[in-house]
From Swiss-Prot:
Span of domain KH type-2: 38-106
Protein family according to the UniProt entry: Belongs to the universal ribosomal protein uS3 family.
SUPFAM superfamilies per UniProt: Prokaryotic type KH domain (KH-domain type II) (SSF54814), Ribosomal protein S3 C-terminal domain (SSF54821)
Protein's UniProt name: Small ribosomal subunit protein uS3
Organism: Gluconobacter oxydans (strain 621H)
Keywords noted in UniProt: Ribonucleoprotein, Ribosomal protein, RNA-binding, rRNA-binding
Subunit composition and interactions: Part of the 30S ribosomal subunit. Forms a tight complex with proteins S10 and S14.
Keyword match rRNA-binding: yes
Example of a GO cellular component annotation carried by this entry: cytosolic small ribosomal subunit
InterPro entries associated with the record: KH_dom, KH_dom-like_a/b, KH_dom_type_2, KH_sf_prok-type, Ribosomal_S3_C_sf, Ribosomal_uS3_bac-typ, Ribosomal_uS3_C, Ribosomal_uS3_CS
UniProt xrefs under NCBIfam families: rpsC_bact (TIGR01009)
Top-level taxon: Bacteria
Record-level GO BP terms: translation
Amino acid sequence: MGHKVNPIGLRLGVNRTWDSRWYAGQDYARLLHEDLKLRAFLRRKLSGAGVSRVVIERPAKKPRVTIYAARPGVVIGKKGQDIDALRKELSRMAKTDVALNIVEIRKPEIDATLVAENIAQQLERRVAFRRAMKRAIQSAMRLGAQGIRITCGGRLGGAEIARAEKYREGRVPLHTLRADIDYGTATAKTTYGTCGVKVWIFKGEILAHDPLAQDRRAAEQAPQR
């Protein structure tokens, strides 16, 4: 079970919480589609900023969007011009004022989504897949990860028959609910077809029941802008 299910979904309410935090009765479908549109727009617009997560909260007054990015300077722009334009565009899409926060990711090497995207970009640049995977594993272990597992699948190296390659180092206990496991995926669009990249990173155990543990850890690492 633990090997098949998404490790983030399995731990929701234990040591992870949802990326969309709001309640709606009749408007649920509309707000869900709005969240999907906002996330797709931000990932497309900020593709060079290293965006890991987009958290959307909807208090009574106005929606609050928090962007977790490895390069916040790209989001903010010169003298804050880019972030002002981004806020206006989000407000136009949501048809109401939107509050925008940026949280810096200090260690992108141990963020599963960013690691997966980095490997996918290297595959698109025709870097050898084994070299890309091993380099990512070495960087993650050096910066404090207790374990990492990477899977690449597709026509690796332009092979005729698609296959999956896996590399692992350290512990990645997928069945342990108290384990703080980050999971991310990415797709590399190569000339031979698409290759999928999956990354699991084990960062230690969270012994207390704390759904906001990961958010608190990210906030401690970097001040909000």
